Amino acid sequence: MAERAGRRCCLGWDFSTQQVKVVAVDAELNVFYEDSVHFDRDLPEFGTQGGVHVHKDRLTVTSPVLMWVQALDLILEKMKASGFDFSQVLALSGAGQQHGSVYWKTGASLALSSLSPALLLHQQLQACFSVSDCPIWMDSSTTAQCHQLEAAVGGAQALSCLTGSRAYERFTGNQISKIFQKNPEAYSNSERISLVSSFAASLFLGRYSPIDYSDGSGMNLLQIQEKVWSQACLDACAPHLKEKLGSPVPSCSVVGAISSYYVQRYGFPPGCKVVAFTGDNPASLAGMRLEEGDVAVSLGTSDTLFLWLQKPMPALEGHIFCNPVDARQYMALLCFKNGSLMREKIRDESASCSWNKFSKALQSTEMGNNGNLGFYFDVMEITPEIIGCHRFNADNMEVSAFPGDVEIRALVEGQFMAKRIHAEGLGYRIMPKTKILATGGASHNKDILQVLADVFGAPVYVIDTTSSACVGSAYRAFHGLAGGTGVAFSEVVKSAPQPSLAATPNPGASQVYAALLPRYAELEQRILSKARGPLE
């Protein structure tokens, strides 16, 4: 993208699973430059597929740390070649794929702080890592370590109350624990352990960047209320871990000025600030500009809910993180596996493969579906753990089938009622000013969005989120520059492009769903108890 000279800006980076991406955002909050390096395509020598290596056991999934370093070299060289004016960059921040960890070898800090501008980063950091292939979020090889961690703190719910989530295989503490157990030498040779986000920030700083509260919440190690490492969790994972992690910081902290390497090699100004990097999900929350009481619903292959919470109630499902734009608040993530594929399956079966007919079915049926409720789980659901299709009539009797139109409304209403019930289970409450931001494939269907507005009793807006983690990182850089904790993020980003209104609740919707929601929750429990069978 062509760059206009002399445009003061902030950069937003995203070190994601498949690529490194950057955007430049000017003072009016317009994106005017973007670029990316795709790991498989642009760095084929690392032999990744989808940016990762899946190991023989099919459970272990890693990425080469030097691939990430080299990708940064490539993208900066591309920007330089395109004539990008680095001297106008006021600050930068970024995002990393969550949960992944990087292991810096003893002595690496010296190499980081004495980089020569004559050489590329990857030429100078070759010997800086004690683990060359980093565990990432797709890894599920740490079940034993998860059991050990939960047992050490008094069970899954106790761990969730402390850290915001029960033990998950991909969470960093369990991955560190596995490395300590399987490769104690690499662990003891690590002077610092970073998340992907704080690793990327360290490359820009020329010294170790602290982990931020929000991405730190995805480790099963941080006490989300007190914002300090939980000693009990650290002890359960590995010895001397506190020193290797460093102290966490608020997500909007300015962690320092950019390393002189970038000033000399690329022409960044010496005063360019680095704002703490965070996880890609928290950065997306910033990019979508969620505010208190808002919900973002990503309607994709799996459906994901992002919530802004004031008073979290950690549970055995979902994840609660410290909020990336307001350190006193929280955010939650809930994932539902049966998303668009389930909607497409019912479309094919009940609407002759036509979205048009699917929409007509939603238009021709009443809110509340005359009391008919359905649960549609083609694959084992995460929230809750149920599989199969279950249909109930207005008398709560299970039935084997619904007419096509009823089936379609039962599916869509059921999916959104489940989202509201599970969100409220984590402490979420709909407020008078609540907005729902819809993204992903199904957000183009106005009739699906109408049901979403009716079930939540709140207006639905659509927003373009193609680069939300990147753009959110640039917004966060502006926020850090403006003073971070002392300044409302919403003030800093108020001139950004507004989302567009797509649906408002129909009159009477709140009464209809006030009656249906408790019924849906009760039936869900009934199916769950039946699936689990009698207790041994």
From Swiss-Prot:
GO terms for molecular function: ATP binding; D-xylulokinase activity. Gene3D superfamilies: 3.30.420.40. It catalyses: D-xylulose + ATP = D-xylulose 5-phosphate + ADP + H(+). The keyword Transferase applies. Pfam families: FGGY_C (PF02782), FGGY_N (PF00370). Keywords: ATP-binding, Carbohydrate metabolism, Kinase, Nucleotide-binding, Transferase, Xylose metabolism. GO terms for cellular component: cytosol. Substrate binds at residues 99, 170, 280-281. This is Xylulose kinase. InterPro entries: ATPase_NBD (IPR043129), Carb_kinase_FGGY (IPR000577), D-XK_euk (IPR042024), FGGY_C (IPR018485), FGGY_N (IPR018484). GO terms for biological process: D-xylose metabolic process; xylulose metabolic process. Its EC number is 2.7.1.17. Monomer. ATP binds at residues 355, 441-442, 445. It comes from Rattus norvegicus.
